[in-house]
Amino acid sequence: MAAVSMSVALRQTLWRRRAVAVAALSVSRVPTRLLRTSTWRLAQDQTQDTQLITVDEKLDITTLTGVPEEHIKTRKVRIFVPARNNMQSGVNNTKKWKMEFDTRERWENPLMGWASTADPLSNMVLTFRTKEDAVSFAEKNGWSYDVEERKVPKPKSKSYGANFSWNKRTRVSTK
C-alpha cells in the first residue's frame, strides 16, 4: 500500500515539475532541460534488480572493519573537550567532544630516527557533538572509556580603571 501511494506522489511531483518546465519554455523560449519520467517508470517496474535495498532489521557492521581483534577489544579511550589555545583569546574548537585512543607500544626507527608504531588507531581522533554520543559510540564498540568533564573557566570581573590604580602593584617602573 505504501509503495502505491509513494508512486502516486512521485507521479504528481514529476507532472508538476514537467508542467512548470513546459510553462517556462513557452514563456521564455529558452531551451531548458525537461525532467523525464524514466525515474518514475523505473520505480514502477518491480521486476528489475535496480530497486533500492531495504533491510527490515538493524545490522551490526562493526565486525567488518578489518582491524585486528587485539586493537578493538582491549582499547581504552579518553573522552574530553579540548582546552582553549593559550596563544589566542578565541574559543574555537572547544565546543565539541573529542575521543582519542590510549598510547600503545612505540619504538624509534633505527634508520631515520622516527617514532614508529604498529597501532592503526593511535593517531585517530574522533569528534562528537555531545558527551553522550561519544560514550554511546565507545560502548557500542566495546571500548572502556574515561570521561574528563568540561572545565568551565570562572569569569573574572575586571574594570579598565584597575589597570591604572596607584595603590596596586600593576604598574612596572622602567628604571
From Swiss-Prot:
Coiled coil: none annotated. One of its GO terms (biological process) is reactive oxygen species metabolic process. Signal peptide: none annotated. The keyword Glycosyltransferase does not apply. One of its GO terms (molecular function) is NADH dehydrogenase (ubiquinone) activity. This is NADH dehydrogenase [ubiquinone] iron-sulfur protein 4, mitochondrial. It is a peripheral membrane protein.
